[in-house]
Amino acid sequence: MESRSKVKTYGKNRRYINKDIEIWASLDERPCALKPRNIENFNNQERSDLEHIHSKPKKDSLLSWNILLKKGSYKENELLAKRNQNLVPTVIIPASPRDNASKSVVSKKEVVNLSSSVALSGKPANNSKLDPLHRLLQIVAQEDALPFSQFVKSQTFEIQKIGEASYSEVYQASNADDVPVVWKVIPFGEDGQAQYADVLNEVQISQWIKVDGFANLHQVVVVKGTYPSLLLEEWDRYLMQNGSENDRPDSYSSTQLYCVLCLDHSGTDLEHFELRSWRECWSVFYETLKILSLVETRYEFEHRDLHWGNILIRKADRSEEEVSFLLNEISLDDIESVDFPGSQDKADDFDNILQVTLIDFTLARASYSQGIISYNEFNDPDLFNGVDDYQFDIYRLMSRVTKGRWAQFFPITNVLWLHYLIHQLLHKKNLSSPLTETETLMRSRLKQIFRLIDPVKTMQFQQAEDSIRSKSTVTSATSLLNWVRQKY
């Protein structure tokens, strides 16, 4: 097929049809970590926030952090990678599959990068002799790629294109029970397309992690062939209504490969979801924090690409009685004394008014049984050269922290993305100044945590020593969650 020279658009969200199906604004973005500031003097700052109920949040000049957020040189990244390529990372991994977060983590055994053919321990991986396609087929339990058109005919009753990203098309398909399922269709293997390592990483981590807060994976299928006419019709309809930045997929040859991920429809991405209150903003942050803490503990998980296109939101499934009780009959002053129905964690139940789902694990890192890990090697220089959005500064921060050691576990990368998330909630969702004590307190919490985990204040880069020092006691999503629960 004709080579596509399109530049990757990491983190640049695409347009959607309407608010009902504005989901997954950026499903194919490319995914990057820190160390520990003493937690002091926040009470005075919080009281100051409460006194200025009608004041608007100041616009942060995040892109002016020159010494910290300087664009990374790709050659520098290459040198760092070469410097560490012969080292065996001191990675902490689970000794066996994790069913709950209470199990302890033990020292590593054999560490295997499933998106590479080399075991980090120096021993060949079990599937290292397989070419990338057959390794992917092995993971999804297929002997060969299925004909694309045959797969579509066997699966769908109704289908509609609802979005796109640089490397994929997103469709909503209804199954036999009329339950909506999202298809993420990823052409891969050719120039200008997703690479095998990217697809392997996302598929493997999606299969490993089965927790609330991650989209339920129904099926992964590798297919081959020209683009089915049914999907082309939907592609054209979407183009007429919304435009498209992707090439029309009719140019794909009969040998073109695709990976199709079939997942639950989990809501609207945060960029397009309309938040109506500071309480809802707090709910988005707190639910995201809890999810990250859980998977950090169970799987040594780092998302490494948690921009607001990869956070899906929908209203929490609650009965009318629960909603009435939580939102109408109590105030924040009552939280510590009220007996909440059906929950032993009062604060969690009160804050859980929205349901959050994290998606897109292309750049993520996770551990599984017997020392096996999956991660992305961040080989694309474009990832570290983005401008005009705090998201791109986070990639550079992660690069400074990891120094090319992407296999290792740096949970503070999750804290970096939580700082980005609070920035988006405070400054990009256009909420009005709070007018009630409850709303003021919710915004005050976010601003307090924003200061607490500010990487400019908590990280000290020692350029001469080529090292990083941290002054913070918050070094992971788990430690931040513990702090939040103790504080509030």
From Swiss-Prot:
GO terms for molecular function: ATP binding; histone H3T3 kinase activity; protein serine kinase activity. GO terms for biological process: attachment of meiotic spindle microtubules to meiosis II kinetochore; intracellular signal transduction; mitotic cell cycle; mitotic sister chromatid biorientation. SUPFAM superfamilies: Protein kinase-like (PK-like) (SSF56112). Interacts with pds5 and swi6. ATP binds at I162, G163, E164, A165, S166, Y167, S168, E169, V170, K184. InterPro entries: GSG2_C, Kinase-like_dom_sf, Prot_kinase_dom. Its main location: cytoplasm. Residues 156-488 form the Protein kinase domain. PROSITE patterns: PROTEIN_KINASE_DOM. It catalyses: L-seryl-[protein] + ATP = O-phospho-L-seryl-[protein] + ADP + H(+); L-threonyl-[protein] + ATP = O-phospho-L-threonyl-[protein] + ADP + H(+). Belongs to the protein kinase superfamily. Ser/Thr protein kinase family. Haspin subfamily. GO terms for cellular component: cytoplasm; cytosol; mating-type region heterochromatin; nucleus; pericentric heterochromatin; subtelomeric heterochromatin. Keywords: ATP-binding, Cell cycle, Chromosome, Cytoplasm, Kinase, Nucleotide-binding, Serine/threonine-protein kinase, Transferase. Serine/threonine haspin-like protein kinase involved in cell cycle regulation. Acts in chromosomal passenger complex (CPC) targeting to centromeres by phosphorylating histone H3 at 'Thr3' (H3T3ph). Pfam families: Haspin_kinase. The lineage of its organism: Eukaryota, Fungi, Dikarya, Ascomycota, Taphrinomycotina. The active site is at D305 (proton acceptor). Its EC number is 2.7.11.1. It is found in: Cytoplasm; Chromosome. This is Serine/threonine-protein kinase haspin homolog hrk1.
